[in-house]
From Swiss-Prot:
InterPro entries: Cys-rich_flank_reg_C (IPR000483), FN3_dom (IPR003961), FN3_sf (IPR036116), Ig-like_dom (IPR007110), Ig-like_dom_sf (IPR036179), Ig-like_fold (IPR013783), Ig_I-set (IPR013098), Ig_sub (IPR003599)
Transmembrane segments: 540-560
The LRRCT domain, residue ranges: 249-295
Subunit description: Can form heteromeric complexes with LRFN1, LRFN2, LRFN4 and LRFN5. Able to form homomeric complexes across cell junctions, between adjacent cells. Does not interact with DLG4.
Locations listed in the record: Cell membrane; Cell projection, Axon; Cell projection, Dendrite; Synapse
Protein name as annotated: Leucine-rich repeat and fibronectin type-III domain-containing protein 3
PTM field: N-glycosylated.
Residues annotated as signal peptide: 1-16
Family named by the database record: Belongs to the LRFN family.
GO biological process: regulation of presynapse assembly; regulation of synaptic membrane adhesion; synaptic membrane adhesion
Disulfide bond positions: C317-C366
Length: 626
C-alpha cells in the first residue's frame, strides 16, 4: 500500500522527463523514395509504374517527381493542400486531361514540368492558382490550342516558357505579349504560319527566341529585334544579346526580309524557299539587292453593274504581286468599307452589298496594296428604281409604262424575282403552246418589231407541282421553242419576255410578250414486265414439267409394247406367225425336208416362243393315192 502513494507522486513528473515526439508523417508510397528526415521534404517516384498520382503523398513535400510513369490524368484532389510544393515533375507520362483547378493549391510552385505527355489543349482554368510559377515546360505534347487566359495567373512571374514540339497553328499573341519577365520562349517545331507585327515588342527581358521549324514565310520587323544585336549562337555573346533561331522555315526572300538580312549574325543554317530564283540558296549569301518585291497589278475587276434598289450586288477585284496584295474598297463617298450590317468584304477581294440603296450608286474604288506599292481600279455601280411589287408566285404580263422599263433581274436574284402564277390565263399577245404531248411542248410567239434592240427572248415556266422557276434563253431571231423534259400529267404556267437594251437609260430591260397555261398529257402506263426471278422460276418449272411428261410417255410406251408382245400361253401359236410344217410327204420317200423360205427379219421380240405340233411319220400317215 505504500507503493501507490509513491507512484502518484512520480506521475506528474513523467511528461517532463520524456523527449518530444515528432509530427506524424504520411507513409511513403510504394516504389517511391521519400526524404522526410530533413527539410526540404521530397517524394521521388520516377519510373515506378504508377497509373495515377499516389493518394498517400506527404502534403508537406517541397519536391514531387512523378516522371516516366503511366499517369493518364491529374485530378483536383491529387495535389490538394500541397501548399509548400516548389517543384513538380510530371514529365513523360500519358496525361491527356488536367482537371480545372488541379494546381489551385500550389501557390508556392516555382517549376512545373508537363513535357512528354498527350495534352491537346490548355484551358483557362487548368493553370489557375500558379501565382509564383517561373518555369513552365509543355514541350512534346499534342497541343493544338492555347486559351487566351491560360497564363493569366503566372503572366507576371513566368521566366521560361517552352511550347516546342506541339501542333500549334495559332497562339494568343496578345497574352504572350504580357509576359514581361520571360527570358526564354520556345516556339520551335510547331505549325505557325505567321507572326503579327509587334508581337514581342513588350518582352524587354527576352534573351532567347526559338522559332525553328515552323511554316513561317516571313518575319515582320519588331522593335525588340532592332534594339538588340542578334546572334545565332549564345556562345561569346553579351548578356543583353537576343538569341534568335528561325532556321527550317520556308522563308520567302523578298523585300520584307531585308531588315533581317542587314543584321549582323554569326553563321546559321537559314535558307530561302522562294521565289524560284532564290529557292534553296543560303539566306546570308543572298545580296540585299536580290530581296525585291513586285508592286500589285489589278488583273480583274467587275464590269459596270446595274441593279434595282433593294437587291444585292457583288463587286469583284483581283490583283497579283509579291507579296500578295491586300484588297480594300472605298465607297463613292470616300469611306473605307469593311464588314458591316450592309456590306461584307472578303479576303479574295470581293465586296458584297447585301441590300443596295439609291445613294450607293457611283464609282467604287478597289485599292490593292503591298510592300512595293499599290494599284487602284474603279467599278461603276448603278442603282435603279425598285421593281414593282409582285404577287407571290406570279409574273405580271402587263406591259410596263412608257419610260419605265423593268430592269433585268440578275441570276443570283432569280429566286426572289417574280414567278409564274397558278392563276395565269392565256393573254391576247399571241403566245401559243401547241403540239404538247406527255413530255414536250412547242411554244410560239409573234414578232416583236415595235421593241427595238432585242437581244434575246426569255421563257420562264413552272409546273403546278412545285414553285421552281425554270428559265430558257432563246436567240433574238427565234419565234418558237420546243420545251422538253416536261413532267407528264401536269399543268404548266409559261411566260415569254423580250430582253432588250433601253435607249433612254442604257440598261438592259425586259418586256413581257405574253403568257399561257397548258397541260401535258398523262403518260400511258406500260404493262409491268414480269419480275426476273419470276421468269426464271417459271422457266424452271416448265422445263421440269416437260422432262417429267417425256419420261412418263416413254414409260407408257414401254409398258404398251410389253403388253402387246408379251408371252403367250403354252400350246398355242401366234396367229400372226405363219409356220410351215417340216413333216411333209415327198413322193413317198424320206428325204431331207426342204425348209421354208426364211421370213424377212422382223423387229426383235422379247421372249417369243413358237411351238410346232408334228405328228409321227409312218405308214398310217401316208397320203392316199390318186
Amino acid at each position: 500500500m505504500a507503493v501507490l502513494p509513491l507512484l502518484l507522486c512520480l506521475l506528474p513528473l513523467a511528461p517532463a522527463s520524456s523527449p518530444p515526439q515528432p509530427a506524424t508523417s504520411s507513409p511513403c508510397p510504394r516504389r517511391c523514395r521519400c526524404q522526410t528526415q530533413s527539410l526540404p521534404l521530397s517524394v521521388l517516384c520516377p519510373g515506378a509504374g504508377l497509373l495515377f498520382v499516389p493518394p498517400s503523398l506527404d502534403r508537406r513535400a517541397a519536391e514531387l517527381r512523378l516522371a516516366d510513369n503511366f499517369i493518364a490524368a491529374v485530378r483536383r484532389r491529387d495535389l490538394a493542400n500541397m501548399t509548400g510544393l516548389l517543384h513538380l515533375s510530371l514529365s513523360r507520362n500519358t496525361i491527356r486531361h488536367v482537371a480545372a483547378g488541379a494546381f489551385a493549391d500550389l501557390r508556392a510552385l516555382r517549376a512545373l514540368h508537363l513535357d512528354g505527355n498527350r495534352l491537346t489543349s490548355l484551358g483557362e482554368g487548368q493553370l489557375r492558382g500558379l501565382v509564383n510559377l517561373r518555369h513552365l515546360i509543355l514541350s512534346n505534347n499534342q497541343l493544338a490550342a492555347l486559351a487566351a487566359g491560360a497564363l493569366d495567373d503566372c503572366a507576371e512571374t513566368l521566366e521560361d516558357l517552352d511550347l516546342s514540339y506541339n501542333n500549334l497553328e495559332q497562339l494568343p499573341w496578345e497574352a504572350l505579349g504580357r509576359l514581361g519577365n520571360v527570358n526564354t520562349l520556345g516556339l520551335d517545331h510547331n505549325l505557325l504560319a505567321s507572326v503579327p507585327a509587334g508581337a514581342f515588342s513588350r518582352l524587354h527581358k527576352l534573351a532567347r527566341l526559338d522559332m525553328t521549324s515552323n511554316r513561317l514565310t516571313t518575319i515582320p520587323p519588331d522593335p525588340l529585334f532592332s534594339r538588340l544585336p542578334l546572334l545565332a549562337r549564345p556562345r561569346g555573346s553579351p548578356a543583353s544579346a537576343l538569341v534568335l533561331a528561325f532556321g527550317g522555315n520556308p522563308l520567302h526572300c523578298n523585300c520584307e526580309l531585308v531588315w533581317l538580312r542587314r543584321l549582323a549574325r554569326e553563321d546559321d543554317l537559314e535558307a530561302c524557299a522562294s521565289p524560284p530564283a532564290l529557292g534553296g540558296r543560303y539566306f546570308w549569301a543572298v545580296g540585299e539587292e536580290e530581296f525585291v518585291c513586285e508592286p500589285p497589278v489589278v488583273t480583274h475587276r467587275s464590269p459596270p453593274l446595274a441593279v434595282p434598289a433593294g437587291r444585292p450586288a457583288a463587286l469583284r477585284c483581283r490583283a497579283v504581286g509579291d507579296p500578295e496584295p491586300r484588297v480594300r474598297w472605298v465607297s463613292p463617298q470616300g469611306r473605307l468599307l469593311g464588314n458591316s450590317s450592309r456590306a461584307r468584304a472578303f479576303p479574295n477581294g470581293t465586296l458584297e452589298l447585301l441590300v443596295t440603296e439609291p445613294e450607293d450608286g457611283g464609282t467604287f474604288t478597289c485599292i490593292a496594296a503591298n510592300a512595293a506599292g499599290e494599284a487602284t481600279a474603279a467599278v461603276e455601280l448603278t442603282v435603279g428604281p425598285p421593281p414593282p411589287p409582285q404577287l407571290a408566285n406570279s409574273t405580271s404580263c402587263d406591259p410596263p409604262r412608257d419610260g419605265e422599263p423593268d430592269a433585268l433581274t440578275p441570276p443570283s436574284a432569280a429566286s426572289a424575282s417574280a414567278k409564274v402564277a397558278d392563276t395565269v390565263a392565256p393573254t391576247d399577245r399571241g403566245v401559243q403552246v401547241t403540239e404538247h404531248g406527255a413530255t414536250a411542248a412547242l411554244v410560239q410567239w409573234p414578232d416583236q418589231r415595235p421593241v427595238p434592240g432585242i437581244r434575246m427572248y426569255q421563257i420562264q415556266y413552272n409546273s403546278s407541282a412545285d414553285d421552281i422557276l425554270v428559265y430558257r434563253m432563246i436567240p433574238a431571231d427565234s419565234r418558237s421553242f420546243l420545251l422538253t423534259d416536261l413532267a407528264s400529267g401536269r399543268t404548266y404556267d409559261l411566260c415569254v419576255l423580250a430582253v432588250y437594251e433601253d435607249s433612254a437609260t442604257g440598261l438592259t430591260a425586259t418586256r413581257p410578250v405574253g403568257c399561257a397555261r397548258f397541260s401535258t398529257e398523262p403518260a400511258l402506263r406500260p404493262c409491268a414486265a414480269p419480275h426476273a426471278p419470276f421468269l426464271g422460276g417459271t422457266m424452271i418449272i416448265a422445263l421440269g414439267g416437260v422432262i417429267v411428261a417425256s419420261v412418263l410417255v416413254f414409260i407408257f410406251v414401254l409398258l404398251l409394247r410389253y403388253k402387246v408382245h408379251g408371252v403367250q400361253p403354252p400350246g398355242k401359236a401366234k396367229a400372226t406367225a405363219p409356220v410351215s410344217s417340216v413333216c411333209s410327204q415327198t413322193n413317198g420317200a424320206l428325204g431331207p425336208v426342204p425348209s421354208a423360205p426364211a421370213p424377212e427379219p422382223a423387229a426383235p421380240r422379247a421372249h417369243t416362243v413358237v411351238q410346232l405340233d408334228c405328228e409321227p411319220w409312218g405308214p398310217s400317215h401316208e397320203p392316199a393315192g390318186p
